[in-house]
């Protein structure tokens, strides 16, 4: 099959878009991944639970779907451990058999925002469309705190 006056149209559905779920350990990445994909990745309150990437599908329209990759928790993109190396390699498209993400969901725990924001600059520097998700706001509120989301958005660009 070909388009009028143009090259042949590709056969089959377009390739799935790839979304990487990234953030520090225990920021809620795997919980969000499970909610989006309906899968049940192990969720625990200690580092190193996700040491490899997990991939699930998120159906967004009748026929469109996203590949969602749950990556190990990291504090930086300078790999110093096996789990940081996995995240680094996937984000840069260097992991064999895993497509480079088109988009990043950066999950930040607002109860540890000062420490977790350090990861935002190198993630944003990758130049991929990035959605920063401020997680655990209910816990921060319970502690009497709040986050200025609009101010933070302006500072992050």
Feature locations, PLM:
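Conserved C-terminal guanine-recognition region of P-loop GTPase G domains, centered on the G4
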Residues: 58-63, 86-157
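Conserved G1/Walker A P-loop phosphate-binding module
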Residues: 1-82, 94, 98-103
């Amino acid at each position: 099959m070909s388009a009028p006056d143009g090259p042949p149209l590709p056969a089959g559905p377009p390739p799935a878009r790839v979304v990487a779920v990234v953030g520090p350990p225990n920021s809620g990445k795997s919980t969000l991944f499970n909610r989006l994909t309906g899968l049940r990745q192990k969720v625990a309150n200690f580092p190193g639970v996700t040491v490899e990437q997990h991939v699930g599908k998120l159906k967004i329209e009748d026929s469109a779907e996203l590949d969602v990759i749950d990556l190990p928790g990291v504090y930086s993109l300078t790999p110093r451990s096996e789990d940081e190396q996995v995240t680094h390699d996937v984000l840069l498209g260097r992991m064999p058999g895993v497509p480079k993400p088109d988009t990043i969901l950066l999950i930040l725990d607002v109860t540890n925002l000062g420490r977790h924001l350090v990861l935002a600059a190198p993630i944003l520097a990758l130049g991929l469309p990035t959605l920063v998700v401020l997680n655990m706001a209910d816990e921060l509120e319970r502690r009497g705190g709040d986050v200025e989301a609009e101010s933070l958005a302006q500072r992050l660009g």
